Amino acid sequence: MRLAILADIHGNIFALQAVAARLEQLQPDAVIVNGDIINAIPFSDQVVDFLRRTDWLIIRGNHEFYYLDYASGRAPASWNDPERWGQLHWLMSHLRPEQGDYLASLPDELTLFYPEAEPLRITHGTPGHNRWGFSNLMPAEDISTTLRDVSQETFVNAHTHLQIDRIIRESEDPLPEETGDPAYFLEEAVRKPHRIWHIINPGSVGQPLNSDTRAQFAILESVPTDVVPGGWRVSHHRILYDRRPALEGYHTTGMMEAGGVISELFYWELVTAEREIPFFFLWKRANLPPDVYSFREQFELYKRATGRDAYIRARDPLLIGGF
């Protein structure tokens, strides 16, 4: 059994088309898209239409919830601020109602039970929290605590835009003979069993954040559990594609003008495959007093202080050529 796992397309139809072409060659038995199919890049409508024509399994991510929650009682009033949330406002006017209905019908997670393979759990973030994710640097104890109620040993997530293939072992209780506990004399079966999880993140199709601008996904192959814990071996893939049409779209569709600072930061992330949005927010919290400058003024001060805009221009394919 071979599964293709895609995630975090973020409206990048060109990256999605490149990955789909590679999947035609690889011929997996099934394709799963693990959330965040829309927003960030200006072609969400085309991505939704593309996915609706497939038989792929699709999961909602946090960006689908941004769209579905806006203009409802679930959205905070702060989302009405066009300076901070103009990107979302632009998206609202560029998806058709039936596309929104499609997003509303998607599940938040999947648990797959193929008869010839071990079960696996798939969520965009962590169970019950689609805006949380894991990284390769996160302590194993924190991950095992989060997954304690997940019975499946293979856990596929996304959200961080980072490719992950990591085995997590829950810390075992001290052996009774080490503590002097009378349980030392009990049967082995009464001791707390050792837990293990195989954490897999396919990376991002449309907007990777691991300093590699190629479109990224994963192939999972079912294997015996004594070969890989959880029974699924992962191979990560990275596909070169032409990013220039996606970058041009920020200007030709009006997203850059409507979305302001956030759209510009999304553009930067497509150029660098680095965490431009967190970089900016961390800098302004550390260096600027609250409620003094507008959001745009904060961003201009950030560029002036860090020279980050020059860093972007030196790498922008629309300015220097290449993909």
Placement of each model-derived feature along the sequence:
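Beta-strand-turn-beta hairpins that frame and shape the catalytic cleft
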Residues: M1-L3, T111-R121, P193-I199, V228-R233
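Ligand/cofactor pocket segment of small-molecule handling proteins
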Residues: G133-E187, K192-P193
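Short beta-strand scaffold segments in enzyme catalytic cores
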Residues: E109-F113, Q163-I167, Q216-L220
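N-terminal active-site segment of His-dependent metallophosphoesterases
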Residues: M1-W56
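Acidic, His/Gly-rich catalytic cores of divalent-metal-dependent hydrolytic chemistry
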Residues: L175-F323
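Active-site neighborhood of divalent metal-dependent phosphoester bond hydrolases
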Residues: R53-F113, A117-R121, H129, F134-S151
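Active-site neighborhood of phospho(di)ester-bond hydrolases with catalytic His/Asp-centered motifs
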Residues: L6-A7, V31-D36, L57-N62, T123, ...
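Active-site environment of divalent metal-dependent phosphoester hydrolases
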Residues: H10-A15, N39-P42, H63-D69, G128-N130, ...
